């Protein structure tokens, strides 16, 4: 509630996880999805959304708005799980409140589970990032909704493998049962570290200020060199292009001793964008 304007969450609504990568990879399987299931993923996305669906043998459909699903798949019942990500990896795009509400309405209509990956939500540079659990988005009804959060980004705790899932109490209870019998419990020391980090807002502001400074420097340098920055309203990345194939841009940066990620790692097919991280030390 303090950070995200989400009310009505109790311990029954929260599930600690061993880092959100593990969660993303195994959630479709833990929800009981199979070859008869359909998973919606963003068109430009973290690859593990697709990997998780593949592990469950589920069908994968890429879409960024419910309107894109009017014809395929059947909008009235064949969708089982929807992933959204705002601010997004790799593009840094921040979804509007109206977009999020559209996904909630679609979820209510289809009976799907909607999971919002909000791991970069503490780092928004333009506009505002909303949680899917915000009353303004879901009307106070968390049924069918889950929000994923990670301490790797907000608290620089990647090595701890610490995150949590929050939302629908029934889904959380079912996942808790499956996960504890699978040995996927967060250790007591890591749990204590999570509590300490989540109780402290000061270090998050320090992190955000550091990334904001780096972002300003990197944006200016890229734009001066002729690059265009697409989206990038949030997250820890700049989604940059100079209008050539992304692999040529990767090579161009490599000759300068700079490592960037090719856009075709995140999209099906070709891409002209590269992901430029803001996480290298000053």
PLM regions: where:
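Helix C-cap/helix->beta junction micro-motif
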Residues: 56, 109-110, 225, 256
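Conserved core segment of the aminotransferase class I/II
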Residues: 136-212
């Amino acid at each position: 509630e303090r950070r995200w304007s989400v009310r009505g969450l109790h311990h029954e609504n929260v599930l600690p996880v061993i880092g959100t990568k593990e969660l993303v990879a195994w959630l479709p399987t833990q929800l009981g999805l199979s070859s008869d299931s359909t998973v919606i993923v963003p068109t430009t996305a973290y690859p593990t959304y697709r990997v998780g669906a593949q592990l469950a043998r589920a069908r994968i459909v890429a879409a960024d708005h419910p309107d894109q699903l009017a014809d395929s798949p059947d909008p009235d019942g064949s969708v089982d799980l929807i992933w959204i990500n705002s601010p997004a990896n790799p593009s840094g795009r921040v979804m509007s409140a109206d977009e999020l509400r559209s996904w909630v309405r679609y979820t209510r209509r289809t009976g799907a589970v909607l999971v919002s990956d909000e791991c970069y939500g503490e780092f928004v540079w333009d506009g505002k990032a909303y949680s899917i659990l915000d009353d303004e988005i879901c009307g106070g009804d968390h049924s069918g909704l889950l929000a994923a959060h990670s301490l790797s980004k907000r608290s620089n705790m990647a090595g701890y493998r610490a995150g949590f899932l929050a939302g629908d109490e029934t889904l959380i209870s079912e996942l808790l049962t499956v996960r504890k019998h699978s040995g996927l419990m967060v250790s007591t020391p890591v749990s204590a570290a999570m509590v300490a980090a989540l109780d402290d807002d000061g270090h998050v502001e320090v992190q955000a200020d550091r990334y904001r400074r780096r972002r300003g420097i990197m944006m200016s340098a890229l734009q001066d060199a002729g690059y265009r920055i697409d989206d990038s309203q949030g997250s820890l990345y700049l989604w940059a292009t100079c209008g050539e194939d992304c692999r040529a841009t990767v090579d161009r940066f490599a000759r300068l001793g700079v490592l960037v990620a090719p856009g075709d790692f995140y999209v099906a097919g070709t891409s002209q964008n590269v992901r430029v991280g803001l996480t290298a030390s000053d």
